[in-house]
Curated annotation (Swiss-Prot):
Function: Required for the synthesis of OHHL (N-(3-oxohexanoyl)-L-homoserine lactone), an autoinducer molecule which binds to EsaR. OHHL is necessary for biosynthesis of EPS virulence factor (extracellular heteropolysaccharide) which plays a role in the development of Stewart's wilt on sweet corn.
Pfam families to which the protein is assigned, alphabetical: Autoind_synth
GO terms (BP aspect): quorum sensing; signal transduction
Enzyme Commission (EC) number: 2.3.1.184
Gene symbol of the encoding locus: esaI
Organism of this sequence: Pantoea stewartii subsp. stewartii
Keyword check for Endoplasmic reticulum: no
GO-annotated molecular function: N-acyl homoserine lactone synthase activity
Protein name as annotated: Acyl-homoserine-lactone synthase
Length: 210
């Protein structure tokens, strides 16, 4: 089974923080070459703290994917890290930002198979989580490569603003809608590609057969 559920920062510290931070270092520093702060083989930053929540995707006891959520009324990447890019964007008082989205490709292939739509499942989990927490959409900053992945998913994302980190490197502030249409579209795709029961994609947390 593939289980996706959310935990608080405090819960993470007593369970899988070391595993998560090591996989984030492997993804964002080693594979993608991002300029992130790493220590003792792990990556974490100032937004990993009380009030932050994390979706964890677990298969056979191993973490295969994750994404982090920070409330917009707290320091976040939009208003702090990339404030110089998006200071002219007005954000709602009540909302959430997602960041540190990743899939460990090697683990996913080994545990789920070459063609399992793990990114699509994690997108669906984000929608179900948002609905469960009364968020109509999710704000996020992505690279051009991630923008292409999201666009191909069929999720009806919206680009709020494009910004240039360097002369060649662009980033995008997006809204990811979390309505019933989005749930049905992403969930229907997961059902068609995995053969799981339709009811399995409607819940939060998610438990999917593999």
């Amino acid at each position: 089974m593939l289980e996706l559920f959310d935990v608080s920062y405090e819960e993470l510290q007593t369970t899988r923080s070391e595993e998560l931070y090591k996989l984030r270092k492997k993804t964002f520093s080693d594979r993608l070459g991002w300029e992130v702060i790493c220590s003792q083989g792990m990556e974490s930053d100032e937004f990993d703290g009380p009030g932050t929540r994390y979706i964890l995707g677990i298969c056979e006891g191993q973490l295969v994917c994750s994404v982090r959520f920070t409330s917009l009324d707290r320091p976040n990447m939009i208003t702090h890290t990339f404030q110089h890019c998006f200071s002219d964007v007005t954000l709602p008082a009540y909302g959430t930002e997602s960041s540190r989205f990743f899939v460990d490709k090697a683990r996913a292939r080994a545990l789920l198979g070459e063609h399992y739509p793990i990114s699509q499942v994690l997108f669906l989990a984000m929608v179900n989580w948002a609905q469960n927490n009364a968020y109509g959409n999710i704000y996020t900053i992505v690279s051009r490569a991630m923008l292409k992945i999201l666009t191909r998913s069929g999720w009806q994302i919206k680009v709020i603003k494009e910004a240039f980190l360097t002369e060649k490197e662009r980033i995008y502030l997006l809204t990811l809608p979390a309505g019933q249409d989005d749930k049905q579209q992403l969930g229907g795709d997961v059902v068609s590609r995995t053969g799981c029961p339709p009811v399995a994609v409607t819940t939060w947390p998610l438990t999917l057969p593999v």
